[in-house]
Amino acid sequence: MHEFSIVQSLLTLIEDYARENNAKSVTKVVVSIGVLSGVEPHLLEMAFNTFKEGTVAEKAELIMEIEKLKIKCMDCGKESEKEELNMLCPGCGSLNTQIISGQDMFLKSLELEVD
């Protein structure tokens, strides 16, 4: 489960940001998870709830925003948001497409409680 190592890195980032902003706690953590990121949201949530104990994010709520796959066709130029996980252009049927979004995971925002 690579979600554990992802959460450990996420918590390090959260701790650093909280320290830089003199926050006594973090109340909300918002992450964006692309459907092709390889991250399983339920496993990420479980890992977050396990590892946040004893950190500045101990009482934080984790909000996960799932980002759909978005592609651009290199033949016809059409940009498409895909419901299914395939790279076929719905405009011309080409497989000559490029991923625009939906393959990353990143920290989107934090809600901090400061002194």
Swiss-Prot record:
It comes from the Bacteria. Keywords: Metal-binding, Nickel, Zinc. GO terms for molecular function: nickel cation binding; zinc ion binding. InterPro entries: Hydgase_Ni_incorp_HypA/HybF_CS, HypA/HybF. Ni(2+) binds at H2. Zn(2+) binds at C73, C76, C89, C92. One of its GO terms (biological process) is protein modification process. Pfam families: HypA (PF01155). HAMAP family: HypA_HybF. Belongs to the HypA/HybF family. Involved in the maturation of [NiFe] hydrogenases. Required for nickel insertion into the metal center of the hydrogenase. This is Hydrogenase maturation factor HypA.
